[in-house]
């Protein structure tokens, strides 16, 4: 398995990728995403097949520092709980450092034990005492 930045050369792999919400990806939309400033996509590939996908954004803070927000990560069922997600998160974290980000953050649910394990194994620190609540508007 290898992790890569999503780019023109591996874009076709995403057209067959189906995430846990059965999202189908459109080539034109993916190309537009690649052209967005501060937006990054990542792909995990095993035997020529996309088995994981993630994306996030560099956020500029008012003090001039940058942080990386990992918005979504998904590993195809059948490849989950085998370390692929952990490797993808490590790859993204390393990439965020090359972009000059002082930290990377993400949101997940406390009851999502497998995701929490993945992020902890990748080096993330869970602030279990935090009283943060994430509101989602659809």
Task: Locate the predicted segments by residue.
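Conserved acetyl-CoA pyrophosphate-binding loop and the N-cap/start of the following alpha-helix
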Residues: 79, 83-91
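Conserved active-site alpha-helix within GNAT-family acetyltransferase domains
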Residues: 86, 110-133, 137
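Active-site acidic-Proline motif in GNAT/NAT acetyltransferases
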Residues: 76-78, 82, 110-111
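Conserved GNAT acetyl-CoA-binding A-motif
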Residues: 96-107
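Conserved beta-strand segments that form the floor/walls of ligand-binding pockets within enzyme
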Residues: 69, 74, 105-107
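Acetyl-CoA-dependent GNAT
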Residues: 1-65, 71, 89-90, 132
């Amino acid at each position: 398995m290898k992790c890569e930045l999503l780019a023109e050369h591996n874009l076709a792999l995403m057209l067959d990728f189906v995430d846990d919400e059965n999202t189908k990806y459109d080539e034109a939309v993916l190309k537009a995403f690649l052209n967005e400033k501060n937006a990054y996509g990542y792909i995990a590939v095993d035997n020529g097949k996309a088995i994981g996908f993630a994306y996030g954004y560099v956020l500029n803070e008012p003090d001039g520092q940058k942080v990386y927000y990992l918005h979504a990560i998904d590993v195809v069922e059948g490849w989950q709980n085998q370390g692929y997600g952990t490797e993808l998160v490590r790859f993204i974290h390393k990439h965020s450092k090359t972009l000059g980000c002082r930290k990377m953050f993400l949101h997940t649910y406390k009851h999502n034990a497998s995701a929490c394990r993945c992020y902890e194994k990748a080096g993330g620190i869970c602030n279990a005492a935090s009283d943060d609540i994430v509101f989602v508007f659809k």
